Amino acid sequence: MKSPARCVRVALAAALLAGLALSSAACAKEEPPPVSVLGPWTGDEEESFEKVLALFESEYDIKVDYEGTISRRETLLAQVQADSPPDIAILPSLGELAEYAHEGELVPLPEAVRERSPAPWSPELAVDDRTHTYWTPVKIDLKSVVWHYPQRPATKGDWCLGMGSDATSGWPGSDWIEDILLQQAGPGVYEDWATGALSWQHEDVRTAWETWGRIVTAGGRSQAREALANDFEAEDGRGLLKPPPAAGCTREHQGSFIRRLYGSKVRFAATADAVPELANDNRAFEVSGDMAAMFRDSPEARKLLTFLTGKAARTAWVAGVKERNRPFFPVSAGTYGEAWGNRSVDRALRGATRLCVDASDAMPPNLVEAFHRAVLEYLDYLGSPKGRKSPLDSLLEQLELERGRQHKSGAPYVPSVCGTP
């Protein structure tokens, strides 16, 4: 028979062990879950971004789960509808982010991040009578430029042009029309149009479409047909602009991201300098960006956003990629090596008088889809035999009706898209 004292000792030991087990379990639960990030980068770009995230994990002892996808809109929408959004999502569409903000899905940026979020990429939004900034550019790109190989003289009308881009086919054409409007009518008209205040049937908008039509068909109507058949990166994924001595088109209107396909031998000029029809002294450029927004608030997510917009992350990102893949930021990283294109893009970004976010990136998604469809229909007309009636009046009317539907439904527009460097 066990003594009462021994029973008490056994009971105390068991209680102590149970307490230690509970304490250990509680400590184990204190480890935060990984910060989930949904972004646009896959392949080599994903590997480069993962290196930046690895530095964050090492510095802060916080794990990050990154998911890269080219179907970012569909993936993010499905996750939000399933009530399981990522902690942070990175995407180029201000229009989509504005919708999420007005639906109450986004968390306002922390103060430290907001201070690093300049115009035109991060406008303030009024949501429920309170004004906040909801997204910040992680990296940016320059548009309003034309690329060429110096060894090959430009041939009139010989433009590299491809509309194919899966679910977003048509955007290279919308980029052209946006840039033409910016160069012809100036930042004020451009901003009114991009923010929903200017009719699609306005004379300046119509003129931009007609100018693009003349540019596309200057080398013959077959160029429009080829544009409909081509992917924007070409069938081989190496770009439409081929180096000498290969034959083919001689100029390409495209954003600075296209450097990754062409390397250091390709050169660019501002659209206003490269396209005689668009000559002006505005020094205004279209830009785009990959914006980070917080869908679920946590100290860890805030730390990651702060890190991604800071100098250490940007320096590591630049150092960890090939010259042709080097990213650009709202504030110059100052380390662009010897590549002519990298230094020149950075100088253009800092030397512009006005920078205006890609208009279709700022518009409501339904209107953007209609814009892309209209581009493809207009190209189909441009590539058809002469004698067919232009559909432009009808296309602009349809786009104006869609603008009206967006206003009637209360779809949010961003309040501004232009700013100074």
Please place each PLM-identified region on the residue numbering.
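Extracytoplasmic/periplasmic solute-binding protein
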Residues: 136-138, 155-206
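Extracytoplasmic/periplasmic substrate-recognition and gating elements
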Residues: 263-327
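Conserved C-terminal helix/tail region of periplasmic/extracytoplasmic solute-binding proteins
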Residues: 347-421
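Early extracytoplasmic/lumenal segment of secretory-pathway proteins
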Residues: 32-103, 119-121, 385
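Glycine-centered hinge/linker elements that transmit conformational signals in sensory
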Residues: 194-233
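Secretory targeting and sorting signals
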Residues: 2-29
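Short helix-initiation/N-cap motifs at beta->coil->alpha
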Residues: 68-76, 225-242
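Hinge/lid segment of periplasmic solute-binding proteins
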Residues: 94-144
